[in-house]
Design a protein with these regions (language model features):
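Acidic donor-binding segment of Leloir-type glycosyltransferases
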Residues: 1-15
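Glycine-rich, basic loop-to-helix element that forms the pyrophosphate-binding segment
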Residues: 16-35
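Short beta-strand-to-loop acidic/aromatic patch adjacent to the donor-nucleotide binding site
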Residues: 38-50
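Conserved donor-nucleotide/metal-binding helix-loop-beta segment in metal-dependent transferases, i.e.
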Residues: 56-71
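Short beta-strand-to-loop element that shapes/binds the nucleotide-sugar donor at the catalytic cleft/hinge
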Residues: 72-85
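A recurrent flexible, glycine/aromatic-enriched loop bordering the glycosyltransferase active site
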Residues: 96-117
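Acidic donor-binding loop at a coil-to-helix junction in glycosyltransferase catalytic cores
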Residues: 133-140
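Active-site-adjacent helix/loop segment of glycosyltransferases
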Residues: 143, 147-175
Length: 175
């Protein structure tokens, strides 16, 4: 946080006690951002995910083409093998989908590593559901979108790198 604050003094850094985990941490950050300003969109970006060059531009272009009314999902590949998709949009059978190289494709739900949530979507769905401590809040958000007729689109190309976490550690959803 100190390096970020030094390099980007305009960034608002939230501190915590390490008990929120991914989903509740996302809720905390999202609520703080929404109180600060009515942004055009909110970006979910996992701290273990590295963005590829042009990723943000691709997300924004895809949102623009979708009229800023759909959830935009970025796909991630394995760090040492860009041909292996590790996170991104999924179909109804829970399988990861390979992004198109040149157009957005629809998905049923998604991993929350790289996701752009337009203001329109936020106004309809709100933030993540706090019932989830760590994992599954991202899947739930996409499925809630389906129930409200909000599509999720996978942006073209591979937008980031993040190695796969093969099994959920026991701390993912503490009791």
């Amino acid at each position: 946080p100190l390096a970020v604050a030094k390099e980007y003094p305009e960034v608002h850094i939230l501190t915590g006690e390490g008990i929120l985990f991914w989903n509740r941490g996302m809720i905390n950050a999202w609520e703080a951002a929404a109180k600060y300003k009515d942004y055009d969109a909110y970006l979910w970006l996992n701290d273990d995910t590295n963005l590829n060059k042009g990723a943000l531009e691709t997300l924004v272009k895809t949102a623009d083409e979708a009229g800023w009314k759909k959830i935009i999902v970025g796909s991630c590949s394995k760090i040492d093998n860009p041909s292996i998709i590790t996170y991104g949009g999924r179909n109804a059978k829970k399988h990861l989908l390979r992004p198109s190289l040149n157009k957005a494709i629809e998905c049923s739900f998604f991993n929350g590593n790289i996701v752009l949530i337009p203001q329109f979507v936020y106004k309809v769905l709100g933030t993540n559901d706090p019932v989830f401590h760590h994992s599954l809040g991202d899947f739930d958000y996409g499925l809630r979108g389906v129930k409200k007729n909000i599509q999720s689109l996978i942006a073209p190309g591979i937008l980031g790198e993040c190695d796969r976490h093969e099994a959920l550690p026991s701390w993912c959803n503490p009791q």
